[in-house]
Amino acid sequence: MAITVHPLSDVKASEIGDGTSIWQYCVVFAKARIGADCNICAQVLIENDVVIGNNVTIKSGVQLWDGVRIEDNVFIGPNVTFTNDRMPRSKAYPEQFLQTVIKAGASVGGGGQLYCPASPLAKKRWLEQVRS
């Protein structure tokens, strides 16, 4: 199986599993790791310190910041928001960003917000909305 990358995407990563499709206007940083048989929909950003398992679907408009870990068979709905810094300051970065883990088989509904460090989202759990 081959990897499919839309010509309007900017994909620098070399660790992408077979059967994965990356659609238009995506940006994938060089050190990101993406498993096999994933579907990365349009307008997704994936930073360097992101690990995505196998058979993962990430719908349009999602940004995966450093520290996000997504296990196998996960669905991330459109426009889901992740954060990796509780006290963001422009140009003042922590030595290491906090991790957010989405466990195998979990689903995050469209527009969901995950504040890090989130408790790992349990296996086969559906997250509709997280409120602050």
Where are these regions (language model features)?
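Flexible, glycine/small-residue-enriched loop-and-beta-strand segment within the central core
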Residues: 2-7, 16, 22-124, 129-131
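Short Cys/His-rich zinc-binding micro-motifs
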Residues: 10
